[in-house]
UniProtKB/Swiss-Prot annotation:
Pfam families hit by this protein: AsnC_trans_reg, HTH_24
Keywords: DNA-binding, Transcription, Transcription regulation
GO biological process: response to amino acid
DNA-binding region: 21-40
Origin: domain of life: Bacteria
HTH asnC-type domain residues: 2-63
Name assigned to this protein: HTH-type transcriptional regulator Zrp
Length: 153
């Protein structure tokens, strides 16, 4: 059972995964050992899936974001497996979501520049055919947050 302290721990770790356990314990009013047990349980139960380093996209030369809307035309199991494998194999495709509506998927690409989109486009087409694709260049990132709200658990 998740309580308010667990939610607070999850929020603190999302804000700073390197926060010392002693500081987390102090903020949630627990002993370090009790806090450590809670963090271990949250990991064990799958609430914490892992810890990653968030990189500065400009510093690693991936400042361009392009969203690609895709209509597949086919919805057979074999085609969808091929599609999922193809997009999973391209590291510049950082998110893929299946949609309702006029398009089947939206892909988020992290690229060094707009011109590099053509390279990715051709890579995708080598593996799967599409009915339609539309690309949209992000002009500005207004909000980006990997942190999820914890008040729903």
């Amino acid at each position: 059972m998740i309580d308010y302290r667990d939610r607070h721990i999850l929020s603190l770790l999302q804000a700073n995964a390197e926060m010392p356990l002693a500081e987390i314990a102090e903020r949630v009013a627990l002993s370090v050992s009790a806090c450590s047990r809670r963090v271990a349980r949250l990991r064990e139960e799958g609430y914490i899936k892992g810890t990653i380093a968030l990189l500065d996209r400009k510093k690693i030369n991936l400042p361009t974001t392009i969203f690609l809307l895709v209509k597949t035309g086919l919805h057979t199991g074999n085609y969808l497996e091929q599609f999922h494998a193809a997009v999973s194999a391209i590291p510049e495709i950082v998110e893929v979501h299946r949609l309702t509506g006029n398009f089947d998927y939206i892909l988020k690409l992290a690229l060094p520049n707009v011109e590099y989109y053509d390279v990715i486009y051709k890579q995708i087409l080598k593996h799967v055919a599409f009915y339609d694709m539309s690309a949209y260049i992000s002009m500005e990132t207004v909000k980006i947050s990997p942190a999820l709200p914890t008040n729903y658990i």
